[in-house]
UniProtKB/Swiss-Prot annotation:
Region feature 2 X tandem repeats of SVP-1 like motif, mapped onto this chain: 29-72
Highest taxon listed in the record's lineage: Eukaryota
Subcellular localization, as worded in the UniProt entry: Secreted
Described function: Neutrophil and pancreatic elastase-specific inhibitor of skin. It may prevent elastase-mediated tissue proteolysis. Has been shown to inhibit the alpha-4-beta-2/CHRNA2-CHRNB2 nicotinic acetylcholine receptor and to produce a weak inhibition on Kv11.1/KCNH2/ERG1 and on the transient receptor potential cation channel subfamily V member 1 (TRPV1).
Keyword Signal belongs to the record: yes
Pfam families documented for this protein: Cementoin (PF10511), WAP (PF00095)
GO cellular component: cornified envelope; cytosol; extracellular matrix; extracellular region; extracellular space
Entry-linked Gene3D superfamilies: Elafin-like (4.10.75.10)
Keyword annotations from UniProtKB, A to Z: Disulfide bond, Protease inhibitor, Repeat, Secreted, Serine protease inhibitor, Signal
Gene (UniProt): PI3
Protein name, UniProt field: Elafin
Signal sequence annotation: 1-22
The record's note on its domains: Consists of two domains: the transglutaminase substrate domain (cementoin moiety) and the elastase inhibitor domain. The transglutaminase substrate domain serves as an anchor to localize elafin covalently to specific sites on extracellular matrix proteins.
Maturation propeptide residues: 23-60
Length: 117
């Protein structure tokens, strides 16, 4: 083995040892600093740099937004005849798709708007 080859092997061993030590001790690699910018003062939100309002919970979730009621009163009529289609077309998907008091019910061939019983 020539001296230059031996020197290259030694350099790689030293570099590998240094990388291994940095990984074990948790030393951050240059350019990967965990904290950038100013350190927030007491009571300041570290994310946006704003002071939190007293009595306001940062983590509390908001109530879900309630939309219009999707079901109308009444029950769907009983349908005695069924079509032979495998996937019949639907004229509606929910009660709000139907005008007035009509409900979206299973018809003889797909969903359709019916006057409830």
């Amino acid at each position: 083995m020539r001296a230059s080859s031996f020197l290259i092997v030694v350099v790689f061993l030293i570099a590998g040892t240094l990388v291994l030590e940095a990984a074990v001790t948790g030393v951050p690699v240059k350019g990967q600093d965990t904290v950038k910018g100013r350190v927030p003062f007491n009571g300041q939100d570290p994310v946006k740099g704003q002071v939190s309002v007293k009595g306001q919970d940062k983590v509390k979730a908001q109530e879900p937004v309630k939309g219009p009621v999707s079901t109308k009163p009444g029950s769907c009529p009983i349908i005695l005849i069924r079509c032979a289609m495998l996937n019949p077309p639907n004229r509606c998907l929910k009660d709000t798709d139907c005008p007035g008091i009509k409900k979206c019910c299973e018809g003889s061939c797909g969903m359709a708007c019916f006057v409830p019983q």
